[in-house]
Amino acid sequence: MRYNSNYLMYFCLVLGIFANIYVIIKITLGSSHILEYFQKNSNLSPKCEINVNNLLSFIENRHFLDLEQKNSQKSQPNYEKTLQLMLFAFPSGGLGNKLFEIISLHGIATSLQRKAVINATNPSFIETLNRNIQPLFPKLADQFTLRIIPDSLVTHQQTNWGRCCVYDDPSRFLNRSDQNLILDGHYFQSFKYFHHIRPQVREWLAPSKLQAMRAEILLPAKFRDDFLICTHVRRGDFQYDGLHRPSDATFTRAATDFLVDLYRKSHERVNVVVLGNDIHFAYTVFEDRVAHFTFLQKPVNNSYDYSLPQISPSYTAILTPTLTPEIDLAFSRLFCDVTLITAPSSTFGWWLSYLAKRTATTYYRDILESKDGVAGEMHPEDFYPPEWIKLKTDLNGKISKY
């Protein structure tokens, strides 16, 4: 019996040596393939069709290491006909606007059985992909092809014109014979353009390991097992642009308190995280619920026509310093059990909710109640998914669900 055990041990040792030699050979051959890839591509003559991988991935060499594996995992149909959008807000809008347009492009292209294409001759499109999309969401950038298509070979079709948040059903273009179709329209801010590919969208926008680590730092360890309500506030240019309505202090606090009371009925530990672009506003609204507020000085005054409520449930409000939008998205994905959109036309607040935990529930302020100017360009049933819950305020300031 002892002889058999030793024999087996020697056999496993020899087998392990051969396995290691095999792995080394595979790694060496893989490296040579990568070198050949660089050499071949350095001598390529210009082509009309440029893949996003080849154009943008030079930024990080590690992207090339994943290229072969990514291509092998793709199972997308290779459509011959192409689709473009005019990408009205893509170069100049915030991250929420950019995501709506580029993901709507892919969703519509899938519905029309066409290849999603971005105009390679437009330098602002290339710069936006390079700076704002590929570094944050490389999997999303991989879904698009850059092409140089002469305008004489493109058929323009006007749709979704002049309104941000209305679904203009693209299925009427399904049987068009045009080889290259471009839809001239604005914003394309409706979940209906891409809701049929939501699992893929969540995969493309999943946080990187570094983003996830940075998001975890924002939440003290003692709160990580709690039921977390994530209140998103949006101020900034919304205060001055004459169209949008920023987060209102009274509604933000009242709606958050309402949700804490609601979920205390089913969860023992309920706390609040405030995400957004105005940390001083957040402190003013939740001053009596904030703990460990040490990363900046307290605001010197209250300019929000707001006073703390006399009656409020007990909870801790965790304020997050504004880092970068993708960190807030990562935080929502990892920790938010409930999201609250306090500025109803905020596209970033929308994405924060759409990409939250799979089991998360979203609440939002009634845009008509807020007197937001975007309401005139919006069909709420096209902008907010039906499972999201609208909140209203009565004459006494009490919050309730519709």
From Swiss-Prot:
Membrane-related topology note: Single-pass type II membrane protein
Biological classification of the source: Eukaryota, Metazoa, Ecdysozoa, Nematoda, Chromadorea
Cytoplasmic compartment spans: 1-6
Recorded family membership: Belongs to the glycosyltransferase 11 family.
Enzyme class: transferase
GO biological process: one example: macromolecule glycosylation
Tissue-wise expression: Expression is restricted to pharyngeal neurons and gland cells.
Gene Ontology annotations for the cellular component aspect, listed alphabetically: Golgi cisterna membrane
Role description: Selectively catalyzes the addition of fucose in alpha 1-2 linkage to Gal-beta-(1->3)-GalNAc-alpha-R, Gal-beta-(1->3)-(GlcNAc-beta-(1->6))-GalNAc-alpha-R and Gal-beta-(1->3)-GalNAc acceptors but not Gal-beta-(1->3)-GlcNAc-beta-(1->3)-Gal-beta-(1->4)-Glc in vitro.
Source species of the chain: Caenorhabditis elegans
Predominant place of localization: Golgi
PANTHER family with a match to the protein in the record: GALACTOSIDE 2-ALPHA-L-FUCOSYLTRANSFERASE-RELATED, UNCHARACTERIZED GLYCOSOL TRANSFERASE-RELATED
Glycosylation sites: 119, 175, 301
Annotated protein name in UniProt: Galactoside 2-alpha-L-fucosyltransferase
EC number in record: 2.4.1.-
Maturation and modification: N-glycosylated.
Subunit structure: May form oligomers.
